[in-house]
Amino acid sequence: MTIAAPQENTVAVVANAAALKVGVPKEVFAGEQRVAATPETAKKLQKLGFEVLVETQAGAGASFTDSAYEAAGCTIITDSVSLWEAADVVLKVRSPQHHPHLDRHEATLLRPDQTLVSFIWPAQNPELLDQLAGQGGTVLAMDSVPRISRAQKLDALSSMANIGGYRAVIEAAHHFGRCFTGQITAAGKMPPAKVMVIGVGVAGLAAIGAAKSLGAIVKAFDTRLVVKEQVQSLGAEFLELHFEEDGSGEGGYAKVMSPAFIAAEMALFAQQAKDVDIIITTALIPGKKAPLLITQEMVESMKPGSVVVDLAAEQGGNCEVTQPGTVTVSYTH
């Protein structure tokens, strides 16, 4: 098996091969609504010389019908096995999963002469890598695309993070018991919600912007001091530790900090948890489990009705009480 981050000229290289078939299977991960190609992007693939195969109902969760794909020139395939057998290149959102209807793992469908393009999270999924290696083939890990200008068009991770940050605020607003913006009524005043965002990457910046647009008071923290101006430009307060250490790592991502720094930031989070209404965590470190930043004790110290949204849940979670894919209601005073 060959596994690598896609380079800038990847599409141009494969597009020169005539009649290659690109397959888009239906995602089988529980609750996943996304699809790897829309009818519009399928048209673009066809213009590059690809034939596009789409599993029936693959786009249903994203409101794309089979007829919409057919109108775009795609061929609808009735089942996953037939699609994998026919495709030269398979496009997925999620990494290969155990298929509930086939009672087998999707990785077993990969052929030695086939290419899989999807999120893989190689460092977090060593068993999956071993399984894919046993199948042969080429795997392009979209989550491993470097954050450089040359690869910007391939940066699906940042695209999803931007949407995730926005959605985190919408979810928080849905579960929060009050308005985000302050209100003055005949019955009295209602203060604006206080939001703390931990991790000011693409998702964090999107969350800050969305929360500010709804009228909340927003604070943000990141180990990388270079993001301070970005936070302030969005009208939020940057929570800063007076510590001679910077968290900027390779490729613009955060790095692992010293024990002393971690202790200082945990003390800051414990203090802020008692004051804010909503905490949104987005902190990730490439190739490692998500750092634990919000402890159970901090959650218990928050005000009744407070909300924590953990965007790092699937990578281990930034919050100790996180249960991926679920809403946990607990710790009432």
Tell me the role of every PLM-derived stretch.
Residues 111-128, 138, 279-327:
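ADP-ribose/adenylate-binding Rossmann-like module
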Residues 331-333:
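Conserved small/polar residues in nucleotide/adenosyl-binding loops
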Residues 25-26, 31-59, 183-272:
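Glycine-rich phosphate/diphosphate-binding loop of Rossmann-like nucleotide-binding domains
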Residues 42, 66, 129, 169, ...:
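Generic hydrophobic/aromatic pocket-lining and core-packing "Φ" positions
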Residues 55-75:
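N-terminal beta-loop-helix "entrance" segment that forms/cooperates
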Residues 2-21, 27, 96-98, 102-194:
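Glycine/serine-rich phosphate-binding loop and adjoining beta1-alpha1 elements at the start
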